[in-house]
C-alpha cells in the first residue's frame, strides 16, 4: 500500500475536545496529531453489530478489556445497539470462528459480525468508521507479533482506493479485527469450499443449519493458507472485495523474550530495513509503516447527513 506524505499540523487557537468525545459541532482547528472523524449516526443506529471474540483459556489482554469499556460508553452515548459473543477453551481457531459465525447467523437481529481477537487493542472510532464505510468486508490494520513491525495484510497492484484515500482494497487481511455484513455468508454458501459439518461439541441444535466452513485452512498455489487468508480468497473468488481502513492502526499484544540475542537480531533487522529504505536508523520506525501513522487522538463528529453513494 502506498505511504502517503504526512500533513503539516496546524497550530490550534481554540480548545479541542478530548480524545473519543462525541460532538455535533466540527472543531475549528485540531491539535497536532489529532484527527476529526465524521460518521453518519443515523445510519449507525440502523446497524446492530455482533462482536465475536475467541478467547482461548477465557483470557483477554488489558488493552482489549479497556477497549470494550470505551466502546460500551460510546455506544450508550450515540444510541447504537450491539451484542457480544465469546468462546473459551477452543484451541482450533478455525472451528472457533465458524462456531461464533453460526451463533451470529442464528441471531437474526444482528446486521454485522465483528471479529475482535482477545489480544487486539482498539478505539471506539475504529469500529465506527468501519461501520460507516458500509463495505461488505472491511478490516483494520495490526502488526504481526514481531519486530520490526510487519502488517498482517496483503495488498496488490491496481487496488481500488476510496476517493478520500482512507480505504483501500486488499487481497487478504487478518480477521483479528474484521467487520463482515450478514449477506456475505449467504453468498459464501455458493462457494465449493463452504461445507456443512457436524455439531459434535455440544452446541444447541438450533445452530446446526449454520455450522459451515466459512473459515478454514487451505492449500492454494502450493501455499498453506490460514483461516483468515482463505476466507478472503473465497470471498474474492465470488467477486467480492476486501477492504481496510488505513486510519485504523491497532495494538497487538504479545509476549517477548528479553535477552541480548533477541536485541542483537532486532538491531540487525532494523539496520537492514533502514538500508533498504535509504533512511537513518533513527527514522526507520515511521518509514517502515505501509500506511499513514495513526492519529494520537480522534474526535468523532456525529453527523445526520446522508452518506454519499
Where do the protein language model's features map onto the residues?
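C-terminal catalytic/acceptor-binding lobe
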Residues: 3-6, 44-46, 194-309
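Short beta-strand-to-loop acidic/aromatic patch adjacent to the donor-nucleotide binding site
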Residues: 109-121
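Conserved donor sugar-nucleotide recognition element shared by glycan-biosynthetic enzymes
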Residues: 93-97, 228
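Active-site nucleotide-sugar/metal-binding loop of Leloir-type enzymes
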Residues: 99-112
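Active-site phosphate/pyrophosphate-handling residues
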Residues: 99, 183, 230
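N-proximal low-complexity "stem/linker" segments adjacent to membrane-targeting elements
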Residues: 2-91
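Residue-level detector of anion-binding/catalytic polar loops
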Residues: 81, 119, 136, 241, ...
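Conserved catalytic core of nucleotide-sugar-dependent glycosyltransferases
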Residues: 123-216
Amino acid at each position: 500500500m502506498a505511504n502517503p506524505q504526512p500533513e503539516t499540523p496546524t497550530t490550534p487557537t481554540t480548545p479541542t475536545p478530548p480524545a473519543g468525545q462525541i460532538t455535533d459541532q466540527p472543531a475549528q482547528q485540531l491539535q497536532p496529531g489529532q484527527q476529526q472523524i465524521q460518521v453518519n449516526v443515523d445510519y449507525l443506529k440502523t446497524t446492530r453489530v455482533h462482536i465475536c471474540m475467541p478467547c482461548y483459556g477465557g483470557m483477554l489482554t488489558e488493552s482489549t478489556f479497556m477497549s470494550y469499556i470505551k466502546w460500551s460508553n460510546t455506544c450508550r452515548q450515540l444510541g447504537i445497539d450491539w451484542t457480544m459473543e465469546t468462546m473459551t477453551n477452543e484451541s482450533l481457531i478455525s472451528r472457533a470462528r465458524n462456531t461464533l459465525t453460526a451463533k451470529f447467523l442464528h441471531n437474526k437481529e444482528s446486521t454485522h459480525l465483528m471479529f475482535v481477537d482477545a489480544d487486539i487493542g482498539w478505539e471506539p472510532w475504529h469500529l465506527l468508521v468501519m461501520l460507516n464505510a458500509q463495505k461488505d468486508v472491511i478490516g483494520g490494520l495490526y502488526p504481526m507479533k514481531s519486530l520490526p513491525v510487519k502488517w498482517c495484510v496483503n495488498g496488490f497492484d491496481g487496488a481500488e482506493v476510496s476517493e478520500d484515500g482512507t480505504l483501500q482494497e486488499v487481497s487478504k487481511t487478518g480477521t483479528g479485527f474484521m467487520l463482515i455484513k450478514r449477506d456475505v455468508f449467504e453468498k459464501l454458501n455458493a462457494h465449493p469450499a463452504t461445507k456443512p459439518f457436524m455439531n459434535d461439541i455440544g452446541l444447541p441444535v438450533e445452530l446446526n443449519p449454520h455450522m459451515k466452513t466459512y473459515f478454514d485452512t487451505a492449500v492454494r498455489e502450493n501455499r498453506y493458507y490460514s483461516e483468515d487468508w482463505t476466507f478472503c480468497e473465497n470471498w474474492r473468488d465470488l467477486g467480492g472485495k476486501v477492504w481496510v481502513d488505513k486510519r485504523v492502526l491497532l495494538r497487538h499484544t504479545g509476549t517477548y523474550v528479553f535477552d541480548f540475542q533477541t536485541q542483537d537480531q532486532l538491531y540487525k533487522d532494523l539496520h537492514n530495513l533502514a538500508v533498504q529504505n535509504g533512511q537513518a536508523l533513527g527514522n526507520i520506525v515511521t518509514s517502515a509503516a505501509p500506511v499513514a501513522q495513526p492519529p494520537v487522538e480522534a474526535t468523532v463528529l456525529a453527523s445526520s447527513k446522508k452518506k454519499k453513494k
